Amino acid sequence: MSAMEKLRLGVNIDHVATLRNARGGALPDPVRAAVLAEQAGADGITAHLREDRRHIRDADIAAIMEAITIPLNFEMAATDEMQEIALGHLPHAACIVPERREERTTEGGLEVAGDDNRLAQYIAPLKDAGIRVSLFIAAERSQIEAAARIGAPVIELHTGAYCDYDAEGDVAARDAELARLIAGAKLGVELGLEVHMGHGLNYDTVAPIAALPEVAELNIGHFLIGESIFVGLEAAMTEMRARMDAAR
C-alpha cells in the first residue's frame, strides 16, 4: 500500500450506548452518534453487539445501517447466534473478536492458531454472503499466519498493550510492543492481508501507528466518545483525523 494512501478512520460508537444503558432509557442515541460521526468524516462505523448486550442492542444494528451511508463494521463473537444476526443484516464487514463476560472491554486477541479449523468453517458463510471478515488478533506471527491460512481477508491488530504501556510511562515496553505491531503489519501485508489496528488509541498514541504504510484503517471509539463530552464529537474527530494525516 502506498504511504500516500489515506488512512481510514472507523469510529466505534459502543460507549454512547454504554451511557444510554446506564439509565435504561433511549438517550443518548448511538444511532445519532453514528450519523454525526459520518457527517464529521468517519470512513466507517464500528458497533460491537456483545452476547450480554451491555451496550449495543439488537435493534441498534438495523437502525444504524438504515441511518448511515458509510460501511458498518459489525464486531461479534464467533457464536452461532452472532453468525445468524450478521447474515440477517449483511453489514459491510464483520470483525470476529474474543469475548469473556467478566471483562470490561475486549482484553486480548482472538485465538486463531489453536482454533483454525472451526474458525475457517465459521467465517465461510459470512464470506459467501459478501461480508468482509476481519479477525481481531494480537500481533503474533502464529496468529497472523493462521488468519491468512483460514482465508480471512483482513486482520485488526490489537493496540491495547501498546497504549497501556504508554499510559503507564513504560517507554521500553511501549516501544517493544510498537515494534511487534510494526512487524505484524509487515507480515500481514506479505501474506496478502489487509491490516487494520485498534484498541485504546488516543491523541498521544495514534501517530506512530498511523505512520505505518501497511495499515489501511484505524478503529477508535472509547477515547473519541470520552473526548466528545468536553469538545463535541466533530471536534474530537477532526483533531484525531489531523493527527492521523500528519503522521502519514
From Swiss-Prot:
It catalyses: 3-amino-2-oxopropyl phosphate + 1-deoxy-D-xylulose 5-phosphate = pyridoxine 5'-phosphate + phosphate + 2 H2O + H(+). Pfam families: PdxJ. Pathway: Cofactor biosynthesis; pyridoxine 5'-phosphate biosynthesis; pyridoxine 5'-phosphate from D-erythrose 4-phosphate: step 5/5. It comes from the Bacteria. Keywords: Cytoplasm, Pyridoxine biosynthesis, Transferase. It is found in: Cytoplasm. Its EC number is 2.6.99.2. Transmembrane segments: none annotated. The active site is at H48 (proton acceptor), E75 (proton acceptor), H199 (proton donor). SUPFAM superfamilies: Pyridoxine 5'-phosphate synthase (SSF63892). InterPro entries: Aldolase_TIM, PyrdxlP_synth_PdxJ, Pyridoxine-5'_phos_synth. The record marks E156 as: Transition state stabilizer. Gene3D superfamilies: Aldolase class I. GO terms for biological process: pyridoxine biosynthetic process. 3-amino-2-oxopropyl phosphate binds at N12, R23, G200, G221, H222. 1-deoxy-D-xylulose 5-phosphate binds at D14, H15, R50, H55, T105. One of its GO terms (molecular function) is pyridoxine 5'-phosphate synthase activity. GO terms for cellular component: cytosol. Catalyzes the complicated ring closure reaction between the two acyclic compounds 1-deoxy-D-xylulose-5-phosphate (DXP) and 3-amino-2-oxopropyl phosphate (1-amino-acetone-3-phosphate or AAP) to form pyridoxine 5'-phosphate (PNP) and inorganic phosphate. Belongs to the PNP synthase family. Homooctamer; tetramer of dimers. NCBIfam families: pdxJ (TIGR00559), PRK05265.1-2 (NF003624), PRK05265.1-3 (NF003625), PRK05265.1-5 (NF003627). This is Pyridoxine 5'-phosphate synthase.
